[in-house]
Swiss-Prot record:
Fe cation binds at C33, C61, C64. Keywords: Iron, Metal-binding. This is Putative hydrogenase expression/formation protein MJ0993. Transmembrane segments: none annotated. Belongs to the HypD family. InterPro entries: Hyd_form_HypD (IPR002780), HypD_1 (IPR042243), HypD_2_sf (IPR042244).
Length: 358
């Protein structure tokens, strides 16, 4: 068995990248996974790449791509008597005026939970209160939400709803290829691909002639993905490959896919930093819409207020890096986040802040 942390193997991979890079002009690769950015920053992978190879972070953080309007909706519901249950990262994301953490300090009932199941247990125990779970995440977390709603479908629980913020990754990849910054290739997300398998990438790869490699999260995984992309570019190919074979099956997690297809359907939704992304969201199917808070409340239109100087939108689209932001590390820090990219552990700005100071 290969030791994925073997330093000699890593050095060999870096040497291989440098040798292959001599055969091309320029190559711009995007990844769409916060865990990949952790690996790239922690181990200084960008520093060892030749100048003609660029790897940029994309919209790989579910907290970061949740829109300000969705945060404001949760705050509106908290102001109107709902118990808001949320994962820890969402608790601190700024809305147009305040965050859920600030609303809690003002007396609103906002609770941090570790899962949707914990929120459901609270709702069952406190029947006199109305609960909303802020459901975020990509294909990796949508099955958990779906499974919980399936189990609740025929049960007498009428005080539990979700604020559905789930999103799909391949559609935003297509948006970036079609309308975003110029990209040559993608390092596809490892966690998402354990659920989806390789199928969602085939159409994109064929349509846009962009190499796509699913990668794991060790330094050697990322380096090998770059090598695989380079080999495709040099040979004039564009195909989907799986570097992360120890975790990702070509067919993905079929059971999780069945749960997603049972509960959700594809819908067009905006992402933070993006306009409406075609099929970019998971909408609840008709038979599960009783859990959709939008079916029970008429949410007023709240105008977004982007903080002056914040470039989270450009960072999420791969147009800029955190170090290009005038607020980074001064006005905007993990203790005082101005934009969503500084809040979550998966956020690009948070990751840059953590590892650029080692």
């Amino acid at each position: 068995m290969i030791n994925i942390n073997d330093r000699a193997l890593i050095k060999k991979a870096i040497d291989k990248i440098n040798k292959l890079a001599e055969k091309i002009d320029k190559l711009k690769i995007m990844h769409v996974c916060g865990s990949h950015e952790h690996t790239i920053c922690k181990y200084g992978i960008r520093d060892v790449l030749p100048e003609n190879i660029t790897v940029v972070p994309g919209p790989g953080c579910p907290v970061c791509v949740t829109t300000q309007k969705e945060i404001d909706t949760a705050i509106y519901l908290a102001d109107n008597g709902y118990v808001i249950t949320t994962l820890g990262d969402m608790y601190r994301v700024p809305g147009s005026e305040k965050s859920l953490m600030e609303k809690q300090s003002e007396g609103c009932d906002v609770r941090i939970v570790y899962s949707i199941s914990e929120a459901v247990k609270m709702a069952k125990k406190e029947r006199d209160k109305k609960f909303v779970f802020v459901a975020i995440g990509f294909e990796t977390t949508a099955p958990t939400t779906g499974a919980e709603l399936i189990s609740l479908k025929n049960k007498d629980v009428n005080n539990f709803f979700i604020l559905n913020c789930h999103r799909q990754t391949p559609p935003v990849m297509e948006f970036l290829l079609n309308e975003g910054v110029y990209l040559d290739a993608f390092i596809c997300p490892g966690h998402v691909s354990t659920i989806t398998g390789l199928k969602p990438y085939y159409g994109l790869c064929e349509k846009y002639k962009a190499p796509m490699v699913v990668a794991g999260f060790e330094p050697i995984d990322v380096l090998m993905a770059i090598i695989m992309i380079l080999k495709q570019v040099i040979s004039g190919e564009a195909k989907v490959e799986n570097e992360y074979i120890r975790a990702v099956k070509p067919e993905g997690n079929v059971l999780a896919q069945k749960i997603i297809n049972e509960v959700f359907e594809s819908i067009d939704v905006p992402w933070r930093g993006f306009p409406v992304v075609k099929n970019g969201g998971f909408g609840l199917r008709e038979k599960y819409k009783k859990f959709d808070i939008y079916e029970h409340e008429d949410i007023p239109e709240i105008k977004e207020k982007i903080p002056k100087g914040c470039i989270c939108d450009k960072i999420l689209r791969g147009e800029k890096l955190p170090t290009d932001c005038p607020l980074f590390g001064t006005v905007c820090t993990p203790l005082n986040p101005v934009g969503s990219c500084m809040v979550s552990d998966e956020g690009t700005c948070r990751i840059f802040y953590k590892y650029r100071r080692i």
